[in-house]
């Protein structure tokens, strides 16, 4: 069935013509079509916005079928980054934005990518290697202020990242505790003497985005700093954030 992936570009073209910027690709019926196409046509390595990406066995349907994840956000990031920039990807997952950032900053720039979930981190490493980038520093760590002593959880039977969930919800039988290293972002970059060189931060951590910002106070003083945050109100509440 993988050979039938040649029909996916046709589907992408039709969807783009129909959507005309109205976000049709985010509607549930279209998402259902994505999942069905992904189920039948999924390949281990796919072309995603100019990069080769190794995918896990499940999840990341849009990567497999659309070849892009959020067209507006993607183009916005590309327009915000300059050659030679030092940028940060917090919650890098398997590397979609890490790869885009690595291409955008060029060989004289640097990307610092943080991903705490080990399964995703291993795929992230392979995707950087697959595309030959040498301007990326990978860290298998979560970002939080030093005074927070967190317990992270993995949600069983889901493909998302690990979650920081407040105590009264941790009795949920679908949650399993996960050990991961945690670091304060300011401390990390002060130790490298680069706290004043960061020009862009992308944050997507399934809830505790505010905690990431609290751990970045020195970096936030940079006058020309640009930030992209993916925020979910419900996940933020569950993180007590």
Residue ranges and their predicted role:
Residues 1-117, 122-127, 131, 174, ...:
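S-adenosyl-L-methionine
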Residues 50-74, 134, 139-193:
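Glycine-rich adenosyl-binding loop in Rossmann-like folds that engage adenosine-containing cofactors
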Residues 91, 114, 137-139, 202-206:
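Active-site-adjacent beta-strand anchor residues
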Residues 92-94, 118, 143-145, 205-209, ...:
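Short, glycine/acidic-enriched loop or turn micro-motifs at the edges of active sites
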Residues 96, 122, 148, 210-214:
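Short N-terminal helix/helix-N-cap motif within the alpha/beta-hydrolase-1
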Residues 101, 124, 152, 212-216:
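Hydrophobic packing residues within well-ordered alpha-helices of enzyme cores
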Residues 187-241:
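Conserved acidic-Pro-Pro-aromatic motif
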